[in-house]
Amino acid sequence: MSCPNSSPATNSFLVDSLISACRGDSFYSTSSMYMPSSTDMGTYGMQTCGLLPTMTKRGEVNHQNMSISVHPYLSQVDGWADPSRPCRIEQPVTPQMPTCSFPASVKEESTCCMYNSDKRAKLNPTAIPAYPRLVSENCSIENPEIPIPGYFRLCQAYPLEKSLDYNYAGEISSNVMPQSNLGLISKLQVSSQPPMERKINEKPNAQESTKGIYVESPEPKPRLLEVSATAEGAATSSELSDNETKEEIKTPISNWLTAKSGRKKRCPYTKYQTLELEKEFLFNMYLTRERRLEISKSVNLTDRQVKIWFQNRRMKLKKMNRETRIRELTTNLTFS
């Protein structure tokens, strides 16, 4: 924005534009150029120029009668203007802001991010040279890291000696090894051995273990001999019984209690009982309670046994009727 001193027309144009913007005029007085008002301009605009109520002439400025605006003064804005211009605004007597290497719009953080490093313990704080302050006072100079928000930040009143003490304590604690980790380390060392050494180490151990087994096992006691003899006798008897049952199964027995496969029938009824129940079933498939009690007394069975037998007999009859019906249908069909 600064213009050379050799062009007074441009300098006078800029001064008039500043004056008209500060007074709130929307148009420039000598030309038809539009200038925005102070409310339309941003934070770095000429809002700080609302401070020139007594500027009547172009080259005369009374610095004692200037009133400071309510807006905060930024020292960086003064560097934009021409240093030889008579309209240069004097900087108020305020504590000087630190010269930042980053733009003024960036919010300077009060603390900086601290990272653990081995270099911090080695550095001597007295040997640090005095450099101009580019960051906040709370940030240590030996840590050139950029402050990052969202991470752990050191307390403002935290001295450097405490951090050195903590680092020293960390070194001591790292040298001390807990007892619980000794077993793991020994296992890792054993596993890291080559396979040949492992085999060599295992062979003498195996020989010692076998020797111990032979030494510890004396002559067998008489009780153990008796138990083994009884177990052998039981095994031989069970084998004989299995052979007998197999022979019985092989020889077909025409008994009404055994089925064709050789297994015993589930029905515990005798031949006389089944004949009496069959007669009653042919006469009547469904029994009343009184008739069921009479049959149970005559056949020497319980009421529940008679009831179950009749239920099973009805299911059997139903199955037989279904099979005969299917057989008749299949025989009547002609396959072409």
UniProtKB/Swiss-Prot annotation:
Pfam families: Homeodomain. Residues 193-217 are annotated as: Disordered. GO terms for cellular component: nucleus. It is found in: Nucleus. Residues 262-321 bind DNA. PROSITE patterns: HOMEOBOX_1 (PS00027), HOMEOBOX_2 (PS50071). InterPro entries: HD, HD_metazoa, Homeobox_CS, Homeodomain-like_sf, HXA10/ABDB-like. SUPFAM superfamilies: Homeodomain-like. Keywords: Developmental protein, DNA-binding, Homeobox, Nucleus, Transcription, Transcription regulation. GO terms for molecular function: DNA-binding transcription factor activity, RNA polymerase II-specific; RNA polymerase II cis-regulatory region sequence-specific DNA binding. Sequence-specific transcription factor which is part of a developmental regulatory system that provides cells with specific positional identities on the anterior-posterior axis. Belongs to the Abd-B homeobox family. This is Homeobox protein Hox-D10.
